[in-house]
Amino acid sequence: MPACRLCLLAAGLLLGLLLFTPISATGTDAEKPGECPQLEPITDCVLECTLDKDCADNRKCCQAGCSSVCSKPNGPSEGELSGTDTKLSETGTTTQSAGLDHTTKPPGGQVSTKPPAVTREGLGVREKQGTCPSVDIPKLGLCEDQCQVDSQCSGNMKCCRNGCGKMACTTPKF
């Protein structure tokens, strides 16, 4: 009889978690600009966030060992990038300059809603299209950095966080 009560309690807790877990209404889990800093692993597995949108201001959801924590990103913010031109397929051009985004539509054309591949001149960084897939924590596999930026990955692979706080070339979500 006590085992049944324990099962009911566990089922109730799972149901409660499912009911109170926020679901994205838009389906967009946009990643914030910048790169996660190299964080010291946290011995207790803390799940402060799962996506960048869970963090306040410009903070990003970063891996620290088996933990996910909100941290101030490294690298230039979008406002610090200037003179970067990005071509959105054949439907329009976006220019980022002095922190402002300008989109020009060609006559009769529509601007693509997919994120463009951005080249940050002078930094040698090329961000590829798509988003990094979500990672179940902890994830088994190589716990070492295989890349720092998308341009170090072959084909359309992106440099994404793996489950142990390191970066690996991964097939993106579109």
Curated annotation (Swiss-Prot):
Keywords, comma-separated and alphabetical: Aspartic protease inhibitor, Disulfide bond, Protease inhibitor, Repeat, Secreted, Serine protease inhibitor, Signal, Thiol protease inhibitor
GO terms under cellular component: extracellular region
PANTHER family associated with the record: WAP FOUR-DISULFIDE CORE DOMAIN PROTEIN 2, WHEY ACDIC PROTEIN WAP
Name of this chain's protein: WAP four-disulfide core domain protein 2
Pfam families to which the protein is assigned, alphabetical: WAP
Domain of life: Eukaryota
Cystine bridges: 36-62, 45-66, 49-61, 55-70, 132-160, 143-164, 147-159, 153-169
Primary localization: secreted
InterPro entries recorded: Elafin-like_sf, WAP_dom, WAP_four-disulfide_core
Subcellular location: Secreted
Domain WAP: 29-74, 125-173
Molecular function as annotated in GO: aspartic-type endopeptidase inhibitor activity; cysteine-type endopeptidase inhibitor activity; serine-type endopeptidase inhibitor activity
Region of interest: Disordered: 68-117
Function: Broad range protease inhibitor.
Signal peptide: 1-25
Subunit structure: Homotrimer; disulfide-linked.
Gene source species: Mus musculus (Mouse)
Compositionally skewed regions (Polar residues) per UniProt: 83-98
